[in-house]
């Protein structure tokens, strides 16, 4: 018979306190700190990684830290496998080389990675535990809608860009590559798939991928590359999903301004698809070589009345073409002139050469004066940039640099 063990009242209270603390203290997930030694290995092995690029002296970074940690705890309970979701951070003061590698221009910046590949769109939503957790849940959800009957194809939303994969089976290398691409580009296209007997009528030459452009009249396009080659498949689908001329909205304006490229914008009424098609064709014909130097965009005249007012235009004047350099706005001539070969290209070249800026301040260049006509130095005050107001706000971020005047 064992002797009874009696605890004094203070000892009993202490033991109960320790027990309660042990039971009710939540397990806090350690946020992974990234450096030059471990960053590639950790990100490459993570299905999804959300990385906080911060600086300790930044007050917005300080405010985000506890929120980021709590969101990590919430997600860790739902995705316990260490490689399913990783919450990580980079001290940009300590690791400026990493900050430069990922072009960090503001603190805090939250970037998403998939299997080591950085996604183009960073997280710009609300900085709350719920919002961050919901964002990760969305990223972990299946981006591909399975088709159970080919008749469903006839009811697709043709205002979207649709990518449809037809596969013999889901457990295949072909589908795994398709799924990987869909995870990256699901914000730009709607992805669908069909398998087995359902997809058989569309697999007469084997597994294949079809692109259905917006609109009912545009013909389908068939992918002819190797289905198991990720790079080739990704590049083909990206080319279809991310158009040369993108629409700017209030939702993506911050993202587009942060790319740092001036805007060539067509303002048009939403229902005026003819002007948009003309603009798209001329951009592709005249300016494809300028893709890395300027963003080609179109905007709804009704939604963007304020920028139009900056250039003394109203929706009644649309379609209107303009350049916003983030310092000034410059208006193209008559929209019909876009069909003159080289006219739109010269407009963009005049921006890069400084001619647009120079002529706004000092009048036409002497070379533009007609023979026998006396040159006049007519200075003007160019309208200020309107779209720079969509750039990251100093009330949400610590901004590291100002835009240079173009």
Swiss-Prot record:
The chain's coiled-coil residues are none
Write out the ranges of the annotated region (Interaction with ITPR1).
Answer: 236-285
Q: Which Gene3D superfamilies does the protein's record reference?
A: Glutaredoxin
Q: Where is the composition biased (Polar residues)?
A: 377-387
Q: Where in the cell is it found?
A: Endoplasmic reticulum lumen
Q: Which Pfam families match?
A: Thioredoxin (PF00085), Thioredoxin_6 (PF13848)
Q: Which residues form the signal peptide?
A: 1-29
The Gene Ontology biological process annotation of the record reads: cell redox homeostasis; glycoprotein metabolic process; protein folding; response to endoplasmic reticulum stress; response to unfolded protein
What this chain does, per the entry, is described as: Mediates thiol-dependent retention in the early secretory pathway, forming mixed disulfides with substrate proteins through its conserved CRFS motif. Inhibits the calcium channel activity of ITPR1. May have a role in the control of oxidative protein folding in the endoplasmic reticulum. Required to retain ERO1A and ERO1B in the endoplasmic reticulum.
The entry's protein name is Endoplasmic reticulum resident protein 44
Organism ancestry: Eukaryota, Metazoa, Chordata, Craniata, Vertebrata
* Gene name for this UniProt entry: ERP44
